Design a protein with these regions (language model features):
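Short beta-strand-centered segments that line the small-molecule binding cleft or hinge
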Residues: 62-106, 178
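Glycine/Thr-rich phosphate-binding loops of Rossmann-like dinucleotide-binding domains
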Residues: 87, 133, 175
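A conserved helix-loop-strand patch within extracytoplasmic ligand-binding domains
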Residues: 90-141
Length: 307
């Protein structure tokens, strides 16, 4: 029998939103196991393997945090699932995927819907996936690559330095900024990043005691959806910088999965949807990826910008 853990050191990045995410996981764990003592470790505490010069949630930053976990600097790591690679480094596994918040994108503006924004409106987007899909939907938009926190981007819109911004609904919700939301963007406009809306708790694969302490907060439906999304990314084989999105949703015992790949300039967007039974997440992800590849995604991946 695996003994019950009494103390757990859990890490996250050090920005405000990451700390809120860590608190969210801590609250769930304390509700499940009130006697579990939890110590927080943050990326700016001078821990080896964490490059604090990089922006929060950047690939190198997340890689540094995962290295810290592999090296045993803490027992578990909380990461927004949208920022994880589809394949984890050797020695790590998913301890839990939390109950998913709204996975969609939202529009922040001064009371204009996306279709109502003036021609050539300036719209902030933090990554190439959002940028490419917005340009595919409205090629006239002037996309500004968003820098800084969600709060700072919202303030730029409110101060009219930007006409609008597209942000993850879950980030806005965690920051309690829902009053600024003008519109939820459907997948016909912008498919979210794989994993968006959930938090992933990573643990070392050989730490049975930690896995036992964490697994109780796993949300099975969210886990299934995200495993399918990651399988889509993995089988698609697109590079890290490619404009790729995926979203799974479960109703009863049916899992619907949709995904897309776009050209960075937004001139092309290849999209497909598949349905299947819960329990066949990897097969569904692979099937969707194959459909997207066969519909033109394979040719798109040969473009110089996506090599």
């Amino acid at each position: 029998m695996v003994p019950t853990m009494t103390r757990c050191r859990i890490a996250s990045d050090a920005d405000y939103l990451s700390k809120l995410e860590l608190e969210e996981v801590t609250h769930q764990l304390k509700e499940l196991t009130p006697k579990l003592a939890i110590e927080h470790v943050f990326a700016d505490d001078g821990k080896p393997g964490v490059d604090v010069a990089n922006a929060p949630n950047s690939p190198s930053r997340v890689a540094g945090l995962m290295k810290g976990l592999i090296d045993g600097e803490f027992d578990a790591l909380v990461v927004n699932a949208a920022y994880l690679p589809s394949k984890l480094p050797g020695g790590l596994t998913i301890g839990a995927i939390t109950d998913r918040l709204t996975p969609y994108e939202v529009l922040i503006s001064n009371d204009c819907l996306l279709d109502e924004l003036p021609e050539h409106a300036s719209v902030a987007a933090s990554d190439i996936r959002r940028e490419a899909q917005l340009l595919y939907y409205r090629s006239d938009l002037k996309i500004a690559r968003a820098k800084g926190s969600v709060d700072s981007v919202i303030q730029k819109v409110k101060n009219r330095k930007l006409d609008a911004a597209v942000l993850a609904a879950s980030d806005v919700e965690r920051l309690k900024k829902q009053d600024y939301v003008v519109e939820f963007l459907t997948c016909s406009i912008c498919i979210p990043a794989a994993g968006q809306g959930s938090l992933a708790v990573l643990v070392r694969s050989d730490e049975e005691q930690v896995k036992k302490a964490i697994r109780g907060i796993n949300h099975p439906a969210s886990y299934s959806e995200i495993i399918a999304e990651w399988a889509f990314l993995d089988h698609l084989g697109a590079p890290e910088h490619a404009p790729v999105g995926a979203l799974g949703s479960i109703e009863g015992k049916v899992l619907e999965l949709e995904g897309m790949i776009a050209s960075p300039d937004g001139t092309e967007r290849i999209h497909s949807v598949v349905k299947g039974s819960v329990g066949h997440e990897v097969e569904l992800g692979e099937k969707l990826a194959q459909e997207v590849l066969d519909a033109g995604g394979r040719d798109l991946l040969q473009e110089p910008d996506l090599r």
